[in-house]
């Protein structure tokens, strides 16, 4: 028998799922609760009514001592992200013996992403007995159970019976419009975001004033730096993410989130870092724009290839509207800045004076927002994805710099290529995951872009501070 308790339910099950299998009044209370619950126990996939065995002292036909319900159903449905119990009846002789210790039951979920076993406790009722298994469902999927009935009082312990034919099917919960709108409000109604938007626009206009049209024409004639950026962003980084997912044995959802993050184009903050670290700003803006355009083709291609290698079959939706919005958010203020530079040179000089302070304020504000927004998604995060996420920006910086060094590019361009490969547009990855996966899976997979974004911003901020300190101590003559 399978009993369910959804999150937020007011129904309580005292005495079930506790540690140990006591006797006396407590076991009688457990038995009474189980008998009361029989008429509305959960159903299996065949919609068969389940009942608790009466506790025979001889094994049934086929030599099976353990059963769930009447033994006719092997697969049981359960909603995702819920608590509940499984009642396993035991017809092993001596199971209901109240004077001598009975056998022990070991239950293992063979897919812990889908189902986790919290504890197992023995119970007795009437002339029979069994076990209550407390479970917690996670992501939607199918979790086979490995059940072992062991006589732990023998030396060595004796395996009485082993079963692998039961499984729990965790069904996805539907996303309600109210929940979705609440989530959107959580991310979009932050007052700090609205305070930063005017600064972002002015800052991008200032970057437009930094664009050198002659340098831009030269890049069109010799696009090697921009091609290096595409190579690092869409070939090397996704491959690195796939290898790390295999090395650290990341769950499929996390692995997919990491690969999509590493397949994303350069982030809008990359040319901000190029400015603060002495890179080529014109090249940085050009590379960010080009990689964002290329992402409309490379992002779905990379995601499809690695999803197949990971045996993930969800249909992935590329957020074209987000990509177009990113392109416009780059192109319009940059174009305004170029126009200001040509028509209003004095105002252009004023913007150039404030671009670095504005950039630093935006960097701190963006880092603060990222930490605030990631609190809920990053709850319960595990060490492997943290370690991998920390290495992604560092490896990207190293790959980009090595590629640029191989072509003997100027130092400023080497820094820019390095930054473009090392700084991903994690918001695009986040949008793609939220559009493609169900809510619980999407939030789980979204840990990867959040960790990469937080790590990248923190590491780049450390580089900027280190660069300022070094420049102050050892100024270039």
UniProtKB/Swiss-Prot annotation:
Keywords: Membrane, Symport, Transmembrane, Transmembrane helix, Transport
Membrane topology of the entry: Multi-pass membrane protein
Disordered as annotated region, ranges: 1-21
GO CC list: membrane
GO molecular function, one term: bile acid:sodium symporter activity
Species, as recorded: Homo sapiens (Human)
Gene3D superfamilies for the chain: 1.20.1530.20
Family the UniProt entry places it in: Belongs to the bile acid:sodium symporter (BASS) (TC 2.A.28) family.
GO biological process, one term: response to retinoic acid
Organism ancestry: Eukaryota, Metazoa, Chordata, Craniata, Vertebrata
First-listed, main subcellular location of the protein, grouped into a coarse class: membrane
Function: The ubiquitous expression and the conservation of the sequence in distant animal species suggest that the gene codes for a protein with housekeeping functions.
InterPro entries noted in UniProt: BilAc:Na_symport/Acr3 (IPR002657), Bilac:Na_transpt (IPR004710), Na+/solute_symporter_sf (IPR038770)
Record flagged with keyword Transmembrane helix: yes
Keyword Glycoprotein in record: no
TM stretches of this protein: 225-245, 253-273, 281-301, 320-340, 361-381, 383-403, 417-437, 450-470
Lineage: superkingdom: Eukaryota
Name assigned to this protein: P3 protein
Localisation: Membrane
């Amino acid at each position: 028998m399978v009993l369910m308790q959804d999150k937020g339910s007011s129904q309580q099950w005292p005495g079930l799922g506790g540690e140990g299998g006591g006797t006396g009044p407590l076991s009688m209370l457990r038995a009474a609760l189980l008998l009361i619950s029989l008429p509305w126990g959960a159903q299996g996939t065949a919609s068969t009514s389940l009942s608790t065995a009466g506790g025979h002292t001889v094994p049934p036909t086929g030599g099976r001592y353990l059963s769930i319900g009447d033994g006719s159903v092997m697969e049981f449905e359960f909603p995702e992200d819920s608590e509940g119990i499984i009642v396993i009846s035991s017809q092993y002789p001596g199971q209901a013996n109240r004077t001598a210790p009975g056998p022990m039951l070991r239950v293992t979920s063979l897919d812990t992403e889908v189902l986790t076993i919290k504890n197992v406790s023995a119970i007795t009722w009437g002339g029979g007995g069994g076990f209550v298994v407390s479970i917690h469902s996670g992501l939607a999927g199918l979790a086979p159970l490995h059940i072992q009935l062991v006589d732990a009082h023998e030396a060595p312990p004796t395996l009485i019976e082993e079963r692998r034919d039961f499984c729990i099917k965790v069904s996805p919960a539907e996303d309600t419009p109210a929940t979705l709108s609440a989530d959107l409000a959580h991310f979009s109604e932050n007052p700090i975001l609205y305070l930063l938007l005017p600064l972002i626009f002015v800052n991008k206009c200032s970057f437009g004033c930094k664009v050198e049209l002659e340098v831009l024409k030269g890049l069109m004639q010799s696009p090697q730096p921009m091609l290096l950026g595409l190579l690092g962003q869409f070939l090397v980084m996704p491959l690195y993410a796939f290898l790390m997912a295999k090395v650290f044995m990341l769950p499929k959802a996390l692995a997919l989130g990491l690969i999509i993050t590493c397949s994303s184009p350069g982030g809008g903050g990359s040319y901000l870092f190029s400015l603060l670290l002495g890179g080529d700003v014109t090249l940085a803006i050009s590379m960010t724009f080009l990689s964002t355009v290329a992402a409309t083709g490379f992002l779905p291609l990379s995601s499809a290839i690695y999803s197949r290698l990971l045996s993930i079959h969800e249909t992935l939706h590329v957020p074209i509207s987000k990509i177009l919005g990113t392109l416009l958010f780059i192109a319009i203020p940059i174009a305004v800045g170029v126009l200001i530079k040509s028509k209003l040179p004095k105002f252009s000089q004023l913007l150039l004076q404030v671009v670095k302070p504005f950039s630093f304020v935006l960097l701190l504000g963006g880092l603060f927002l990222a930490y605030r927004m990631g609190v809920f998604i990053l709850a319960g995060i595990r060490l492997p994805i943290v370690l991998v996420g920390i290495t992604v920006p560092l490896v990207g910086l190293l790959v980009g710099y090595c590629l640029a060094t191989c072509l003997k590019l100027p130092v400023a361009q080497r820094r820019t290529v390095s930054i473009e490969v090392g700084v991903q547009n994690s918001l695009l990855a986040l949008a793609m995951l939220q559009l493609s996966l169900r809510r619980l899976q999407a939030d789980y997979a979204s840990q990867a872009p959040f960790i990469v974004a937080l790590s990248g911003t923190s590491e780049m901020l450390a580089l900027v501070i280190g660069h300022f300190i070094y420049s102050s101590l050892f100024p270039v003559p």
